[in-house]
Amino acid sequence: MAYSFTEKKRIRNNFGSRESILTEPDLLAIQIDSFNSFIQKDSKTKQDIGLHAVFQSVFPITAVNGYAQIEYVDYELQEPKFNVEECKLRGVTFASTLRVKLSLVLFDKNGSTLKKKRKIKQIIEEDIYLGQLPLMTETGTFVINGTERVVVSQLHRSPGVIFEHDKGKTHSSGKILFSSRIIPYRGSWLDFEYDHHEHLYVRIDRRRKLPVTTLLRAMGLSSEGILETFFEKTTIKLKAKSCDLNMVPIRLQRTIAEFDIVANQDVIVEKGRRITAKHVKLLKKVGIKSINVPLEYLLDKVISADIFDKDTGEILISANTIILEEVLELLNINKIKKIEILYINASETGAYISDTLRLDETQTEIEARMSIYHVMRPGEPATEDAVNLLFNNLFFKNDRYDLSKVGRMKLNRRLGIGSETGEHVLTNDDIISVIKLLINIKDGNDSVDDVDTLANRRVRAIGEMIENQFRVGLVRVEKVVREGLNLAETDELTPQDLINSKPVSAAVREFFGSSQLSQFMDQVNPLSGVTHKRRISALGPGGLTRERAGFEVRDVHPSHYGRLCPIETPEGPNIGLINTLAVYAKTNSYGFLETPYQVVKNGKVTKEVVYVSAIDEITHTIAQVNAIVNDKGKLMSDLISCRHKNEFVLVNSSKVTLIDIDSKQIASVAASLIPFLEHDDANRALMGSNMQRQAVPVLKAEKPLVGTGIERVVATDSRVCVTAKHSGVVEAVDASRIVIRVDSKKTKASELGVDIYNLTKYSRSNQNTCINQKPLVKTGDKISAADVLADGPSTDMGELALGQNMKIAFMPWNGYNFEDSILISEKVIQEDRYTTIHIEELTAYSRDTKLGPEEITADIPNVSELALAKLDEVGVVYVGARVKGGDILVGKVTPKSETVLSPEEKLLRAIFGEKANNVKDSSLRVGASKSGVVIDVQIFTRDRVEKDDRALSIDAERLERIKKDIDDEFGIIDGDIFRRVRLKLSGNMLSKVAGDIKAGEKLSAKLMKKLDNKDISKLKVEDAAVNKEVAALIKQAKAKQIEFKKFFEEEKAKINEGAELPPGVMKMVKVYVATSKTLQVGDKMAGRHGNKGVISRVSPVEDMPYLVDGSTIDVVLNPLGVPSRMNVGQVLEVHLGYAAKGLGYKITAMLDEKRTDMVKQIRDFLDEVYNSYGKQENLASFSDEEIIELASNLREGVPMATPVFDGIKEKDIKSLLKLADLPESGQEQLYDGRTGEPFDRHVTVGYMHMLKLNHLVNDKMHARSTGPYSLVTQQPLSGKAQFGGQRFGEMEVWALEAYGAAHTLREMLTVKSDDVGGRAKMYKSIVDGKNLTESIMPESFNVLVKEIRSLGIDVELEQH
């Protein structure tokens, strides 16, 4: 196999038994692909999807009078003004200007108004500004008002039809009531439901129910038509005392004979006997066409069609009449010889529609429509036109109802219609088919649907959500435009005058700014960002709510297999409602989640891979990945455990149709990062996958010794690492930039031969963690496309590295690891193993107030010189200054006055200057418990407001930096172009004299060295083709020079122009303070198996337990934390980690020994380590230098990969421990650091990858003496952010009462709470040196009195 540049440096020993034939897809594809298809990026001709489809669905808009029409032509997204970094800095949205080309068509008023015959009088075409559309960044996020946000995909109920029952919970009788629902993508929901009397009702949009026949009648069916649609008929020929029944033998099956059934004078079925299949077969054989039955047989049967009087034509008996004695008499009197009755068989088909029809009070189509109108619009007057318009708009018009492509496909599939396409509105046939299927289900001939299966839930991704917002905005615009079009010709209007962009841009802005699904990006580490973008939420608009979601919808469903992770979900009230995509899952064109499988044919696994949705999966028999397969792909076992129709079954290998693609297919990215996941309890695995997202990036990331093999994929797909676009050679590298000279073979003449990668240095993430990139390459390194060039936060050599590998011992230690507490060695802190950098952004605004503008200045009243020492003359802190709690970062004064100044007073003050006492100090200060170093200051000034000296110097610095970057880039590119020119000219004959070189002389590299680039560009050779290529390259250099010059001018203009600031803000100063935080008591740490704990003590190195060789333990964990938690994976990780470290020590010894045959010795040892188990590595292809470099990188341990559900076996761990010269038990004799005595028994020792979580004690620790109080109750505020106090609640009061601490209790309930007067007296007595507590009236009593007074009851207090 081919290794990448970084993989060669450090190979992870993979123990997976079966390699997947499919590589992991781009983990951010669900976001990026959806948005790209919405804006149709990189497509020359626009398809009918996304934004283009929205415009096409709303336009053309035609005037009411039909003489004007506005049509959509095309749209264009312009380049954003600022790049992503500038948007974050300035606090603006990274967006593109959307311009839409519309044409206004005016028709001749004298011509026909018919669409096809209208004469066009005039066409006015114009580009319309339709607002700003936020663009997705390369990492799948949006920058909204300077902050990175992620739009979470939504899992909602799929449009289509669904059949269900209430499980007998609705009615007290416990009777199961069936129902069905047609769910459109947009429009009214249509519900059909049975009541406990078995009548069928319809609800529109969950309104009051109506008999289903009312809807059918409104659709144009008569009573007779309704019965004909839903029932079969039986023909009866009437005689004087009996009647002949038309015989259909199959209909008699399972009924009880009401009379003797006789054929050829033989009694086939006696009266009172149940008719069986055998009887039916006999009757068919005999071939009876009719049977004579007594007239009493007709009683209680239902007439299927109207019976008319032959003479008058009047209806004698209407359809759906139950035959009683009187009806038989009427038939006899009128000499009716033939009637048709409904075939109703109690055991097969119920009379539901017939019974419901009798309840229906409507008789005609218009009456039925009126009835629906009164339910939908109660209280509104119902005219015939309004009634018809409402009914037609409900389900049958595109502008009000849309089933969508998905809905039509689901509806057709469920109803058994062959085609998956059709109209996006309902038809009469659709509604009738749904009712028929519901009756079938009620009769037991079909089954209800599973509501929670992923076949009935689809993903609505970002593109679709913005599409819906655009449609909402354009529909608002449409109403206004339609009215305006009537005046289009007379007022000489243009499209620009008619279209108002505000409703559209407001809808989009509202979605990105305040939608429940547009979330502040989780950016603690690369994994948290990837997981956030792959999150699937059932909450949000059009989804579920926490309160109403039951257990079933939250539970893991068999259809989640390979699509949604069964492990990763939040622990709180959102459990099961927020899920994460499985590693290989993707959405199909309908929005349903699909997972890949390998096709199995005749018991043989093929190389063909198919993506299958939950809808199609039901028909397949799917084997698991661990099924035994031979070298030729043949399934070896006779009986194989498979999944079929959501159940596990044992089947013959020939019946298997698909097989899983990979063992980690079931899990999400975070869950598949947990080694030995298969040995952990699911609850702890859930905590483990959630806590990995909270790991803070440490100063020096360290790869996990025990991983799962997916670490590299996560690191590269998260885009925190820098990856090469093309293969080439590293030309130059420093801390902030990497320059690659692209392979000349892969560079076309028109392309640049240089790639320049600028690295991110000490940038702030959303959670204030540090984003910093470090180069991995050296000058001269040969790299390939997609190789990792630079590490980002929490990555080590292109692999995800969330924590540190710590030497662990599972043992009790003086109670310091009681209840999951963690004991750590002082050495861990001294080595800065868990030191993290946190960057905080603090912002000061200078506003224009009613009393005059606020001023940023160093001249602040009543502030000492010492407090101003770190500020420059403008009043802004210096970069590099060390600041602590309470220090001023930006000096600012705000005008204060009792009265609002008149314009005249303002003018006088402006002329004669202001007095110092008219301003108050409103400076930006460092928070009480914070400290750090100022690493950057940015000043933004509004247009037409004069910039101060500091702002000008910052701008000049930024401009200088841009100029240097441009000069460097151009120098590199120009140098590369002329290097290629020299190569092209070399060896050719000169055609014209150039300086000292004569015509006809052969050009060599030595000759050309004497010439500068200017001279080189003038050389002409005899070969015309070479001259042409050289001219093209020189032209390219000049074009690049012009491009850079233009770019510099644009950047200069951007810097010099005023910033877009919030209303009323004149100036904005951003100060970035970096804090270095070491590990300390109270910080939270965790492993990857849900084994979390809080540091209880930092012990001196000499007190820690130590091994025989004197090496000390880094972390001591409680062994009692393992058995009850059932996360044994952590113990296995410790054993394998110990073996990995031991192998590293052996390699170190070999390198340090420096034997003559060292390379061979190391090569043989590495071959034994890598190729004795699991995946085989091709070490023979490595050169000696590469082997030595690989060995050098393995000094700290050989990294292992044990994929989830396909991990290393116990015997292999023991073999590795033996190979590393360590005890096979994984246990060692430890000695007490304080006494030197050995512990009683051997202890499990090894290496575990431990994380420092973003729950730091410094951010939580808080103390208050006095501080702010609530305005109404006058009680202290709560929370650290408000510098609040600690709540002393009801139960705490009981505790003090129990101890009889009366004085303390009085103090708590009065002066320390809301006794304002008492507080003042207390302060005075402390100042006077006395110790008196005098309580006056608590403010909460005054509040209570006020509330009683608001009820109209006066309360007066009497003095006693």
Curated annotation (Swiss-Prot):
Catalytic activity annotation: RNA(n) + a ribonucleoside 5'-triphosphate = RNA(n+1) + diphosphate
This protein's record includes keyword Transcription: yes
Keyword GTP-binding attributed: no
GO cellular component labels: DNA-directed RNA polymerase complex
Record Pfam families: RNA_pol_Rpb2_1, RNA_pol_Rpb2_2, RNA_pol_Rpb2_3, RNA_pol_Rpb2_45, RNA_pol_Rpb2_6, RNA_pol_Rpb2_7
Stored Gene3D superfamilies: 2.40.50.100, 2.40.50.150, 3.90.1100.10, DNA-directed RNA polymerase, beta subunit, external 1 domain (2.30.150.10), DNA-directed RNA polymerase, subunit 2, domain 6 (2.40.270.10), RNA polymerase alpha subunit dimerisation domain (3.90.1800.10), RNA polymerase Rpb2, domain 2 (3.90.1110.10)
Gene Ontology biological process terms in this record: DNA-templated transcription
Molecular function per GO: DNA binding; DNA-directed RNA polymerase activity; ribonucleoside binding
Matches recorded under PROSITE patterns: RNA_POL_BETA
EC number: 2.7.7.6
Keywords: DNA-directed RNA polymerase, Nucleotidyltransferase, Transcription, Transferase
Domain of life: Bacteria
Assembly and binders: The RNAP catalytic core consists of 2 alpha, 1 beta, 1 beta' and 1 omega subunit. When a sigma factor is associated with the core the holoenzyme is formed, which can initiate transcription.
Reported function: DNA-dependent RNA polymerase catalyzes the transcription of DNA into RNA using the four ribonucleoside triphosphates as substrates.
Family annotation (NCBIfam families): PRK00405.1, rpoB
Protein family membership: Belongs to the RNA polymerase beta chain family.
Name the record gives this protein: DNA-directed RNA polymerase subunit beta
Organism: Ruthia magnifica subsp. Calyptogena magnifica
